Amino acid sequence: MENKKNKKVILVVIDGLGLRKEKIGNAFELAKTPFFDKMFKEFPWSFIQASGKFVGLPEGQMGNSEVGHLNIGAGQIVYTGLSLINKDLEEKNFINNKAFLEVIEDVKKNNSTLHLMGLVSPGGVHSLEDHLFEIIDVAYQKGLKKVSVHVFGDGRDVAPRSIKSSFEKLEKITNKYNYDIASISGRFYSMDRDKIFERTEKAYEALLGNSNSKFDNWSEFLNKQYSQEISDEFFIPSINASKNVNFVKDGDSIIFFNFRPDRARQLTHLLIGSSLYDFKPKKPVKINKFCSMMKYEGIETLIAFEEMEIKNPIGKVAEKAGLKQLRLAETQKYAHVTYFMDGGVDIEYKNSKRIMVESQKVRSYADHPEMSAKGITDELIKNAKDFDLTILNYANPDMVGHTGVLTSTIKAVEILDYELSRLVDFAQKNNITVFITADHGNAEVTEDDKGNPQTKHTSNPVMLITSDKNLKLKDGKLANISPTILDYLDIEKHEDMNEESLIIK
């Protein structure tokens, strides 16, 4: 029997590619994918659950890249921000939250304004609007008079023009308490994560009340933006025209109710003057108390909810076993194969290498469905022979799927198919075993049955494919993947990894 300790493994995480039989709007089924066809026919594979309770999210909640990579790396179900926060929401514990209360007491003491900012969306990927509504309730119960809400439009994790219902719910509660909707910005500006600070600063300026784009009410604002073919994600940072509205100024305090950190850090940096980035705003502001819903890595804030700690992810177990490791992705997903795969910690292991292939800086990946996939495969072919465990990410199906352009998403899947054929061919020639999975669904539902674009993630299962034809795999969930790989390598998993291997023996 071959000594598995000499085996090398490449784990490919495809971003945003689920399994669905229906062809309507299904870029995966409609694409020409000769290599995928070959793999599903000739290689062992199984179904993997990547959403809802299987990844520590509420029942039926679609998966996402952060949660997916956390679960893959941890080898256990990771109860993330949404689940943790929802528990307190259901138990009406927001009113007892120490961080919230510290902010509120400071606002009362200084007769300042509390600013609530974040993605107002039912999506549950970066935020959940119900959290905002509960915080508003708490602010009122605690006697705050001056509360301003700064709305970030979604249109990416939910339908492109779906914010109307969120505004209706928000207006009902702000009118009830005489609070204000002070500014509106699309997440394209307020939640950039690619260090394009020209975008972030436009959202920042709107928070301070500096914008030439103004609105009298949200309904008029929506009509104007939509008439210019601007969807929720791309709302021009705009401010309430009323002279009575309080914008962010020195001495005020902020609660940023986004729980996911990656798209919250740049704007937070500008507001509190952190040292995380070099970019500084032209008009800095002094915030008294800044509370983030969860920890934003690299930035010091009050933290409302502490995340579950992952102490022994696959990277650490592999390091202790003496394995050389390679992590590889393009800019858009680099944090996912490093920070999130390692349990929400930025760590470089001994005998490891990280390679980030630069993502193209474009307005829409619909026009560039190739993204940087070729560069990722090229780097893998150059480097993987020197490493025992390689973990990489292909971003195409997710990032192009988010555009809702079916033809482009089909092209993205076809490009991925070709790059996987190159990767597996290289691996087989060098006695490296490949495992291929995905972190969540997306590209398999790019349009609905009426042809309307669908840009959000899905709750469909994904695949786990292996190039080792001697294996048999059973169905499972993302948290089973690390135990499966360690089992294949004859490495004992850590006791924290309480999920089993999917290899049938």
Curated annotation (Swiss-Prot):
Residues annotated for Mn(2+) 1 binding in this entry: D398, H402, H457
Pfam families: iPGM_N, Metalloenzyme
Gene3D superfamilies in the cross-refs: Alkaline Phosphatase, subunit A, BPG-independent phosphoglycerate mutase, domain B
EC id: 5.4.2.12
Sequence similarity: Belongs to the BPG-independent phosphoglycerate mutase family.
Known partners and oligomeric status: Monomer.
Record's protein name: 2,3-bisphosphoglycerate-independent phosphoglycerate mutase
